[in-house]
Amino acid sequence: MAVKEITPQEAHDILTSDASTVYIDVRTEREFANGHPQGAVNIPVAFPDPARGMVMNPDFVKVVETNFAPDKKIIVGCQAGPRSNAAAGLLQQAGYQDVANMVGGFGGMRDPSGNVVAPGWAASGLPVSQDNGEGVSYQSMVAKAR
């Protein structure tokens, strides 16, 4: 099944009109702490590894399953779109039916020349938060899965 794609503005509109929808920011903990869509929770789909670049988070689906039921409406986003597209696919494989990937992510998607091809959440002027505490941080999400 193809992953549904939405723009940052569409994501914001859904989150504003449907409080039961959750936004999962799949970027690293550091990226999340530097700013994220208001109301987002952080569950990284991959972690940085100095020797290998990015490595998949083996607990990604488990942490999502612990925190959110399979019938939950979920929007996933990353920095530009590719990581969240992969995360959305993993969630669909795990049985989540209502998952959308936010194209452009938080920072915007660029072509090889550096031109913005899909503006991100921040550039769209949407609400940004730096809250990284209980209930939104990866550490608080993963603690429930232990």
In which residue ranges do the predicted regions lie?
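Rhodanese-like catalytic fold shared by cysteine-dependent sulfurtransferases
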Residues: 1-22, 29-73, 84-146
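Short, surface-exposed ligand- or partner-binding patches at beta-edge/loop junctions that are enriched
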Residues: 76-77
